[in-house]
A protein has these predicted regions:
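Outer-membrane beta-barrel porins/channels
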Residues: 19-33, 38, 107-480
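Bacterial Sec-dependent N-terminal signal peptides
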Residues: 1-24, 480
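Residue-level signal for alpha-helical transmembrane segments in multi-pass membrane proteins
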Residues: 9-17, 60, 74, 430
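Alpha-helical transmembrane segments and their juxtamembrane interfaces
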Residues: 13-14, 68, 403
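Outer-membrane beta-barrel translocator/receptor signature
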Residues: 36, 48-57, 63-140, 215
Length: 480
């Protein structure tokens, strides 16, 4: 526990261990993907129903199922990230095959009563994918990662470093001779340090590879009252797994007299968690061609375990030194995500054109890490950095037998109070519905901007990132 607190306090690497509010945002944010039909229409299903992915949006839609159904959705994803650092543009990408959805719906007719059906469903939906690769490279003649370590180490005695009673990066830097004590003549100035790099320009290179996903097991129940009012509830049990591996290199480019030639610093962070939430929803059929809907999502309460491992290697002209530090005991904490509210409407034109729209609101400042005494800084940062935001989704569907054409758009608002890191989704799809079975395909283009700090923001400006995700989604379903 003490070592982790020291690592957090140092805040040298903002990717893995420095900002607990980053973890809170990651597990509170969801992608706008699901079955092929859901994805093709921008996820605007709050008043439509009859779609398994919508059980994680507005569970009232379960009341619209008139037949039992099985659905299965694989997807193929290509993610690319472009970085812009000190005049150098770099790109990286990864590909992945996912299972986005698997579910069963059972209809239970109630006969000649006002409650026409009571339906139940079980399955799971993928809510977010964490697969991403980032590559950052450029030359820096200013303050470097090593300078950051030197300044953070100043104030610790040599005895502190030798016994490991300092920030873990400082201890590793000492043990690998990345830093040395400052001398005043022949006397050591204890508590003051210098870098063994020269003062010249350094080439900096970093790769960040993350993988994992946020999935939700859903248990839903709902019904239809007089085919006018549809009510539903979903018990969600989300599970998350996240791994991030970051490798940073800093090396001399101009000074050939320096004995220290290169620093390699790597970090590996893993997180596993599970939680629970409740979603309640209603849809009302105003007329044969117009429906409205509303839903509310309680906060998800997560229990999360993390492991962190780091390694530092220094390369000299005639030797290489390696120092690693890991954490064998997992660090466990709790996270509560924000509430979410959704209002929706949909209408039909000319019997074959469907238009739908959703409006979502959630307040990222309401996320909270527990226990309080461990996360005072993180919770203050959540309140300061994040904001209340809105998501807008629009979808359309045209039935031109035997095909169904679809398109959608979603604007997912930025969680950050002072920076526009919103995302836009553009989607298209095609479906075939043969009564007893259906097959849908969708393409989704998702784009958004972000930033990454190579190390402490007092030493360096953020690197600009542009992330693009291409998703090809297939759904097959059977009714019985």
């Amino acid at each position: 526990m003490i070592k982790r607190i020291l690592v957090i306090a140092l805040a040298i690497s903002t990717t893995l261990n420095a900002q607990n509010e980053v973890d809170a945002l990651r597990y509170s944010t969801q992608d706008n993907l699901g079955t092929a039909r859901y994805s093709a229409m921008g996820g605007a299903f709050g008043s439509l129903g009859g779609e398994f992915s919508a059980l994680s949006l507005n569970p009232a839609g379960i009341g619209m199922y008139q037949f039992s159904e099985f659905t299965f959705t694989p997807s193929f994803n290509i993610n690319s990230t472009k970085s812009y650092y000190n005049g150098t543009n770099t790109a990286d990408y990864n590909t992945r095959l996912d299972i986005s959805n698997l579910g069963l719906v059972f209809t239970i007719p109630k006969g000649d009563t006002d409650w026409k059906r009571i339906n139940i469903a079980i399955g799971w939906n993928q809510l977010a994918s964490y697969n991403r690769s980032i590559r950052i490279e450029g030359d820096n003649s200013g303050l470097t990662f090593t300078d950051n370590i030197v300044d953070a180490t100043n104030g610790f005695t040599i005895n502190d470093l030798s016994e490991g009673n300092a920030y873990s990066e400082s201890v590793m830097a000492w043990n690998t001779y990345l830093i040395d004590p400052l001398f005043n003549g022949d006397s050591v100035v204890d508590g003051q340090y210098i870098s063994n790099f020269s003062n010249g320009t350094k080439n900096q290179f970093k790769t960040i590879n993350s993988r994992g996903s946020l999935n939700e097991f859903v248990f839903s129940v709902g019904g239809s009252f007089q085919e006018k009012l549809y009510l539903g509830a979903t018990l969600g049990i989300p599970t998350l797994d996240y791994t991030e591996i970051a490798n940073y290199t800093e090396k001399e480019t101009s000074d050939t007299t320096s004995n220290l030639r290169q620093l390699d610093y790597s970090e590996e962070f893993t997180a596993y968690g599970h939680g629970y939430n409740l979603k309640l929803g209603a849809i009302y059929r105003v007329s044969e061609t117009f429906k409205v809907g509303g839903a509310i999502h309680t906060p998800t309460v997560y229990t999360i375990e993390e492991d962190y491992y780091t390694d530092m290697i220094t390369h000299f002209k005639d030797s290489t030194l390696d120092q690693s530090m890991g954490y064998e005991i997992p660090f466990q904490y709790n996270l509560t995500t924000p509430w979410k509210a959704i209002v929706s409407a949909s209408t039909i034109f000319n019997k074959n054109i469907l238009i739908s729209a959703d409006y979502e609101i959630l307040d990222y400042t309401k996320g909270k890490l527990y226990p309080d005494y461990e996360f005072e800084y993180g919770n203050k940062a959540i309140s300061k950095i994040y904001q209340k935001t809105e998501n807008i989704k629009i979808g359309a569907e045209m039935n031109i037998k035997p095909f169904i054409l679809r398109a959608g758009y979603a604007k997912l608002g930025s969680a950050f109070a002072n920076k526009d890191f919103s995302r836009e989704n553009f989607s298209y799809g095609l479906g075939i519905n043969n009564g007893g079975y259906y097959f849908d395909i969708a393409y989704v283009l998702s784009q958004g901007a972000n930033e990454h700090l190579l190390y402490n923001e007092e030493y360096i400006a953020p690197t600009s990132l542009v992330n693009t995700n291409h998703s090809l989604i297939f759904t097959i379903g059977f009714r019985y």
